[in-house]
Amino acid sequence: MTESPTTTPGSTSGAPSGVPSGVNDAESDAPRHRYTAELAAGVERTWQQNWARLGTFNVPNPVGSLAPSDGSPVPEDKLFVQDMFPYPSGEGLHVGHPLGYIATDVFARYHRMKGRNVLHALGFDAFGLPAEQYAVQTGTHPRTRTEANVVNFRRQLGRLGLGHDSRRSFSTTDVEFYKWTQWIFLQIYNAWFDAAANKARPISELVAEFDSGARSLVDGRDWSTLSAGERADVIDDHRLVYRADSMVNWCPGLGTVLANEEVTSDGRSDRGNFPVFRKRLRQWMMRITAYSDRLLDDLDVLDWPDQVKTMQRNWIGRSTGASALFTATRSNGETVGLEVFTTRPDTLFGATYLVLAPEHDLVDDLVGAGWPAGVDPLWTGGGATPAEAVAAYRRAIAAKSDLERQESKEKTGVFLGSHAINPATGQPVPIFIADYVLAGYGTGAIMAVPGHDQRDWDFARALGLPVVEVIAGGDISQAAYTGDGVLVNSGFLDGMSVGEAKQAITARLESDGHGQARIEFKLRDWLFARQRYWGEPFPIVYDADGRPHALDESALPVELPDVPDYSPVLFDPDDANSEPSPPLGKATEWVHVELDLGDGLKPYSRDTNVMPQWAGSSWYELRYTDPHNADRFCAKENETYWMGPRPAEHGPDDPGGVDLYVGGAEHAVLHLLYARFWHKVLYDLGHVSSREPYRKLINQGYIQAFAYTDARGSYVPAEEVIERDGGFVYPGADGEIEVFQEFGKIGKSLKNSISPDEICDDYGADTLRVYEMSMGPIEASRPWATKDVIGAYRFLQRVWRLVIDENTGEILVADTPAELDTDTLRALHRAIAGVAEDYAALRNNTAVAKLIEYTNFLTKRHRDAVPRAAIEPLVLMVAPLAPHLAEELWQRLGHTTSLAHGPFPAADPAYLIDDTVEYPVQVNGKVRGRVVVAADADDDAVKAAALADEKVQAFLAGASPRKVIVVAGRLVNLVV
């Protein structure tokens, strides 16, 4: 229990000096001790100070600086609750932001009152573009702006009375935090994925296996004969972090590359809405694809919304099929294998041409010197030579997004002037490039089967290519047939079903050395570099030959240097040929260093990219468990206690992780996927005991509001709009103008943002908390209506009046020793049982409804004074929702300790059983009356009561029913 506060908040604060806006004008004459916005402000301010002074929400760790000072063990019953932490924007919070924070606070407070050791803290995801863009505009260092925003966020969140352990708060921009982000990067960099063991292992173990001869090189070279540089190349190719010349999403308007997940479906940047181009650049990549199977399979053990699981499954995109090797001839005469992946190997005999992604590595090698005799002009794209046609086609599609390329109704492409041999038929087929084939999926090459794939059919029709039927059942002259059937025109496969043919052709490809069964994924490796300033620097330097070297852990943190200009070189948003130029390159003294990496002092250059904004959020849950540890990112004992598997509690396949994580579904394939990947690597390397970061996830809905636009589509301030005669007008500078209402997000740009400060000023933070929780289920979006806040305010006033005399400030509670009457006991214990069940399930809206119902019951039942035994449980039940008011009433009721640690009241099952049952009485199927009988009444007693009811008798008018049907506990039906 927490010690008693030394001050009595609100009890001597005096009468309110004015009326908060939004509250009934009658409150200007309110009694001195009424619960008003001013009184609430005093109560809330003082209790927040008390909680901070007493460390009410400080939670102990098993070991380290936050362990109990007396050496006592931590409670076994723990709960780790986490919110997706906010980005501290300059605009501050609007009323939609606290929805999830309040919900988790109610959940945490309830379980804390039930005696659990609850970890609940909140940090800030503070790296990112907005602070950097502000710095570019003003010349202010991003840290200055970010820290000011964090101060404002903490002030706003503090007003809400959230029960966070403030000792555990941090920002991802804190050097003490991003030191460990860099450390984790090094763990991943210095690891490789052992496919046989299906896990990551230290790279040193791979080197040892090569040195000992236990592992051979896949290309057949002798490890012992390789030079130091060649060995380094081999090792670098195995690392989980590697550099690759790969196709990336280049955004000239932002001056940086973007991950696939940061590009919208129409090929523009998610932030700024600039065009994004596909460009080949050398970039840092993380080998997340090595974990594709585990990321998919472990979704089954997570208590997550089906929507999020489906989004991750679709993003990872596992496909089962086969690879097939077509042989082609390079322009220099060498034979080369062209590997394709297909989920339909059964259609191999129907492959009449090949299509490569325009970015495929082999395209330039396969371009013919000239057009073959008799080439169809439709195939050439108007080019004088294949090389000219390919170059022109690549230029034409450079600005298209992947989605545009895949969904385009018009199929285009050009012939390379060369052919490949179909391994099933032995016949040559022409090779094309086309934009509907993507380099990032499969092998970047497809075998085109126009008879049974509609995109291939469309392409074949457009370019006059042959269409062959290999599965009977459709009319391929009209469209591709994608249904089931038996194989035809397929040699030894003829007559087989699709399933049989898949197995048979795969076996033949394997035996002939022309292919094999294979699983492919849509998931691509994670592009892990940004050409920005405000992000975590890489702990990487380059030697004079351009070879990367990881810094030793002792060199961490690598701190961001000051630079004269924070902006990358920005380009015309449509300039696809531009090249990135990171801001850190301007800090020349920081970039160029002399270091001793074990072979003497030598010159090196630092990496001038920074990590993406997702880096800090990929592991921050772990830092909450041990935020002050200077020696490790977190002590294993603390991680095991807060996040380790608990099979006795959660089942034998419990993956461990945070007990409850709440945040938006928009992060399903970004933050949540990246965090799972990092956590699994840390698990494989033995740094954590949990194999997943988040055991249970809930996606909160959104608070939405009306916005208003004028005839030009420009938004006007929503609070100034007047509703009149079924329409809306805005009093502009030149008089009233008609405006148009729309419903959706809340935001500064829509001019409909409402600050929680306004509601706290006008009603108090507890009212805001109760209102937001009463609006609907946590997962549902809901409309904001300031006019409805008064309902929550008046509910809290009624609770206050049950305890406090508004005129005198005296306690109204009856300290009678007599036992409560049966009706009150039944109402009390039903409320306790229902509210407890709702809190545990995060059904806060129905908990509010039950508390209102019980409050109304007490108000009507006990008009003079409510018995203490009836009111104290109400105060305890209200505490998770309205903690300031509850603490104040609890103290005024004579208690000397805070109720933050309980006890939460327990329901007596004896009062949860109904003594009576109400039966609707139907006559020929229509309800004509209702009767109340004892819960254990037999059918005869129920029939007698129904027939004796005055309303039923009046309707029967002396007639006798032919039949009386009793459905036990539900209804009586009289058939006349």
From Swiss-Prot:
Residues 1-34 are annotated as: Disordered. One of its GO terms (molecular function) is ATP binding. A motif ('HIGH' region) lies at residues 86-97. Its EC number is 6.1.1.4. It comes from the Bacteria. ATP binds at K748. Transmembrane segments: none annotated. InterPro entries: aa-tRNA-synth_I_CS (IPR001412), Leu-tRNA-ligase (IPR002302), Leu_tRNA-synth_edit (IPR025709), M/V/L/I-tRNA-synth_anticd-bd (IPR013155), Methionyl/Leucyl_tRNA_Synth (IPR015413), Rossmann-like_a/b/a_fold (IPR014729), tRNAsynth_Ia_anticodon-bd (IPR009080), Val/Leu/Ile-tRNA-synth_edit (IPR009008). It is an enzyme of class 6 (ligase). A motif ('KMSKS' region) lies at residues 745-749. It is found in: Cytoplasm. Pfam families: Anticodon_1, tRNA-synt_1_2, tRNA-synt_1g. GO terms for cellular component: cytosol. Keywords: Aminoacyl-tRNA synthetase, ATP-binding, Cytoplasm, Ligase, Nucleotide-binding, Protein biosynthesis. One of its GO terms (biological process) is leucyl-tRNA aminoacylation. It catalyses: tRNA(Leu) + L-leucine + ATP = L-leucyl-tRNA(Leu) + AMP + diphosphate. Residues 1-23 have a biased composition (Low complexity). Its main location: cytoplasm. Belongs to the class-I aminoacyl-tRNA synthetase family. This is Leucine--tRNA ligase. It comes from Mycobacterium marinum (strain ATCC BAA-535 / M). The gene is leuS.
